[in-house]
């Protein structure tokens, strides 16, 4: 797509592109973390064993939470690849890799991965009217309109729809719609679309997100509790360049990795970004 306007380039160049000191600290640490892994498990729910005394959060069928818990993973010891087939420079921070394509363009980065997972779930549920995202200029892009054969036209900072002859309801067409979202949406726009959630109300599918230049987003993909009502959770991300969506290790508390402790959480230090407890948000 050569017709990428300067406004979007400036915003998206910095959407997920600058590592903070936390990533400089952990990037090349050779971590020897004994992960609680069931090598025969092929989903997020079955791959990672529970910590002692904890019970996995039960999710209802046909919900986003259940969809993420049962998301298939690539085989144990798989490596994180970039969109161009190259290996990610740092292979020491992931505990597992989601079995979903990254595409062959440098598009599916941080916020894009969370939007992809959300949209894929809604697509499988045939909830097409619920699939919509805003571009960074505020223009709302509804997948339901795309399915009817409408396409997007970008001129300067203006976006408009135009009608083609045919409806396009295939999965391939859906992925083409998502590429437009990846190009013109990001942490800045997604952050404005989501609603803030306190840590005490965290659910699977919630997102830690910082919108801006730079910005980043990681998604909660599993949770568990014990009898003392202590909660732990698991996180997944993509990064830049566009790369496989992967489960993050907990480098700050290797004894519970890849789980993270929600109790008294004020600062969340993930391997490549630092978040605040105020950064937790939920899809509407």
Which residues does each predicted region cover?
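Positively charged n-region of N-terminal signal peptides that target proteins for export
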Residues: 1-4
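C-terminal motif of bacterial Sec signal peptides marking the signal peptidase cleavage site
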Residues: 13-15
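Cationic-aromatic interfacial patches
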Residues: 17-101, 108
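Extracellular-facing segments of soluble proteins and assemblies that are Gly/Ser/Thr-biased and enriched
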Residues: 99, 103-195
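Short, well-ordered loop/turn sites that connect or cap secondary structure elements
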Residues: 196-203
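Short coil-to-beta-strand transition motifs
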Residues: 209-217
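Short beta-strand-centered aromatic/proline hotspots
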Residues: 216-225
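Low-complexity, Gly/Ser/Thr/Pro-rich intrinsically disordered linker/tail segments
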Residues: 231-284
């Amino acid at each position: 797509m050569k017709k990428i306007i300067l406004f979007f380039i400036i915003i998206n160049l910095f959407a997920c592109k600058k590592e903070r000191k936390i990533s400089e600290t952990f990037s090349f640490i050779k971590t020897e973390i004994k992960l609680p892994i069931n090598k025969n498990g092929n989903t997020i729910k079955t791959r990672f064993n529970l910590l002692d005394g904890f019970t996995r959060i039960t999710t209802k069928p046909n919900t986003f939470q259940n969809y993420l818990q049962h998301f298939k993973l690539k085989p144990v010891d798989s490596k994180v690849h970039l969109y161009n087939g190259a290996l990610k420079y740092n292979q020491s921070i992931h505990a597992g890799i989601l079995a979903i394509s990254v595409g062959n363009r440098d598009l599916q980065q941080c916020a894009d991965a969370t939007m992809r997972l959300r949209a894929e779930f809604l697509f499988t549920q045939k909830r097409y009217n619920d699939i919509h995202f805003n571009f960074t200029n505020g223009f709302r892009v509804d997948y339901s309109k795309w399915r009817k054969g409408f396409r997007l036209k970008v001129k300067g900072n203006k976006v408009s729809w135009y009608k083609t002859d045919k409806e396009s309801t295939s999965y391939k067409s859906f992925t083409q719609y998502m590429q437009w979202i990846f190009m013109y949406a990001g942490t800045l726009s997604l952050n404005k679309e989501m609603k803030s959630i306190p840590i005490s109300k965290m659910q699977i599918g919630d997102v830690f997100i910082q919108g801006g230049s730079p910005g980043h987003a990681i998604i909660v993909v599993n949770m568990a509790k014990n009898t003392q009502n202590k909660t732990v959770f698991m996180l997944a991300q993509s990064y830049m360049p566009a790369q496989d969506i992967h489960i993050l290790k907990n480098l700050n508390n290797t004894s519970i990795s890849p789980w993270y402790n929600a109790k008294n959480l004020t600062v969340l230090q993930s391997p490549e970004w630092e978040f605040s407890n105020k950064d937790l948000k939920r899809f509407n």
